[in-house]
Regions:
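HDAC/HDAC-like amidohydrolase catalytic core signature
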Residues: 1-158
Length: 158
């Protein structure tokens, strides 16, 4: 059986997340995936598939390109424009329901305000490597998808 994996998941490794009004250790963390990957790598019937880089095009096809661009630089901008912080989360959130009957609004310019525009919860803080880890996860999903579609197109038609 084939499996798809990247070590880049280590790049998203926050120490805390805000959930239920408290600072908590994240439930999803690199060590959890490391254990799964180790079990697969040492299993006699598993084969790791090398990933195909897909770039940002597929991501921007399904997400607001401005949000993708923002997330690519948000952590670094926050360090310069607001303060040095290992984890970055929004302080406030844009509430589109408050704008009912008005135009759709536009993203604010300050990075700390943009966090609340593009992010909508506090259990996934941004860290220095979050964007790279997220784009690598897309390569995992799309490489697997490519393989499935390739095998379907190669299958004989009955």
């Amino acid at each position: 059986m084939r499996y798809f994996y990247t070590d880049k998941h280590h790049l998203h490794d926050p120490r805390t997340e805000i959930e239920a009004s408290g600072l908590n250790e994240p439930r999803e963390k690199p060590a959890r995936l490391d254990e799964i990957a180790h079990a697969l790598a040492t299993g006699p019937t598993f084969e790791r598939v090398e990933l195909t880089p897909h770039g940002l095009g597929p991501i921007k096809n399904v997400h607001d390109p401005a949000m993708v661009d923002f997330l690519s630089e948000a952590w670094a901008r926050f360090q310069v424009q607001v303060r040095d912080s290992r984890e970055v989360v929004p302080d406030v959130f844009a509430m589109s329901s408050l704008r009912l009957g008005m135009d759709g609004g536009r993203a604010p310019l300050p990075v700390d305000a943009q966090l609340g525009w593009y992010c909508f919860e506090t259990t996934t803080p941004l860290v220095a490597g979050t964007f790279e880890a997220a784009t690598a996860a897309v390569d995992v999903a799309l490489t697997a998808t490519d393989l499935v579609f390739d095998s379907l197109s190669a299958a004989p038609v009955a």
